């Protein structure tokens, strides 16, 4: 099952899967951020975080993204086993190298039930933290419903 989910995930990342997150994420998905200590539960909040990450760590389809392929978000390795995938990624943000992994677990229905992100090195974590905070603040009207503000 994970092979099909990851094929769909890659299609979503390329902008080729309409309503990709809605189709891929289980209603009760749990998102583990490298920045936020508390796991984020639910499709709506996970969608928000993944959309913010998509803006913070731009891929090839982003306007104004570097024409240098080595600076764009890209997956460099993947390991699929059972219902779990580990996808290693690299990118450059504001001249800083970012390396990390997405650990994705799906259920037997083909929905993502857990999404973990880990990032290195420390300067990348600090940069992504700052940019994610700015992006979430920009998305605040949408995010307030999730944080009870």
Question: PLM ranges: what are they?
Answer:
Residues 1-149:
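C-terminal and inter-domain tail/linker signature
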């Amino acid at each position: 099952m994970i092979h099909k989910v990851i094929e769909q995930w890659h299609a979503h990342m390329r902008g080729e899967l309409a309503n990709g997150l809605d189709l891929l994420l289980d209603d009760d998905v749990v998102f583990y951020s490298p920045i936020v200590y508390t796991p984020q539960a639910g499709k709506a909040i996970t969608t928000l975080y993944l959309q913010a990450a998509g803006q913070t760590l731009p891929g090839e389809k982003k306007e104004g993204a570097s024409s240098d392929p080595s600076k764009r978000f890209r997956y460099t390795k993947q390991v699929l086993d059972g219902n779990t995938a580990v996808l290693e990624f690299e990118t450059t943000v504001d001249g800083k190298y970012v390396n990390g992994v997405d650990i994705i677990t799906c259920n037997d229905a083909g929905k993502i039930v857990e999404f973990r992100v880990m990032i290195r090195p420390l300067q990348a974590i600090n940069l992504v933290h700052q940019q994610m905070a700015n992006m979430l603040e920009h998305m605040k009207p949408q995010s307030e419903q999730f944080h009870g503000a």
